[in-house]
């Protein structure tokens, strides 16, 4: 906040407003868990496993196979973002400035220029960091390649059984010309010509497109494809107050507070795809098992490998352990290990898995 308060002599009473950007994430996520955060900071959700399909045996006691207790995993969401702002509008200053600082108007300005951008940028960063599918591109998208990259993203999601509806493509603003001028965009999208004429981005291959200011897109990400059911962003408190002549102040005191957070739903993480710059995604670990001992390795120098043996996804699980070559995990016969690589400044790898046979 600037420190100057300009008292009017012969100035216009009109305030020059700045450009701003409406929220681009508000309709991008599921609200299925919002009510679960009422009255609590932490919510835990179950992921229930399934049983294997066996060959039926027509004799003996366990004809359907050997019964095993159905297992489950627990994923934890902890709401940590608690932000506030405050400012005053002194009655004397207001009188000497043509009352240009109206509390209601200034609060709306605060929301659109400070609060909304902060929440949008935070959400996108969290969702990108937790993306279930992260692919590093060999080069930045161009007019000749961007269409194929988007189709590849679609195919990767399809192969993970992500529903084909409720997907949204978030594209860096600087990449819009490459997409709008690509031959695939004109040929495949019936709204292509209209979009070019009006300057409004519509759909590409059936996917709604939203462009994002380059500075809002997570670092080293070209575009994100998000399925609505894969991301959540609960808002526990969204409170704004205007106090008139509170104790100690002749004028108005404006206060605001938001308690919120953003998460990727672990069991649906494949519904978030990011296309990144080259070398910005950790390589998927390799797993080798000998004498019931698991050896994990990653081709990404300096990466940390997280692993689980309870069936949960190591990228999101509270039971994940950090791998050390000095203390390799020991597996029972038939036990499965899952591993993923993480590193600061890079996006997480895919999950590798292997069963001790």
What are these language model-derived features?
Residues 200-248:
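Glycine/small-residue-rich hydrophobic helix-like segments
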Residues 277-357:
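Short, compositionally stereotyped local motifs that mark structural "simplifiers"
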Residues 240-284:
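Extended, compositionally biased alpha-helical segments that mediate assembly or anchoring
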Residues 44, 50, 65-67, 73-99, ...:
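Structured, hydrophobic secondary-structure cores that serve as assembly/anchoring elements
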Residues 129-200:
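Extended, solvent-exposed, turn-rich assembly/linker loops in the middle of proteins
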Residues 1-77, 270:
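N-terminal "assembly arms/tails" that initiate or stabilize quaternary assembly
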Residues 53-56, 178-181, 263:
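Short helix/loop capping segments that flank catalytic or ligand/cofactor-binding pockets
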Residues 94-160, 276-278, 357:
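Alpha-helical scaffold segments that mediate packing/assembly in large oligomeric complexes
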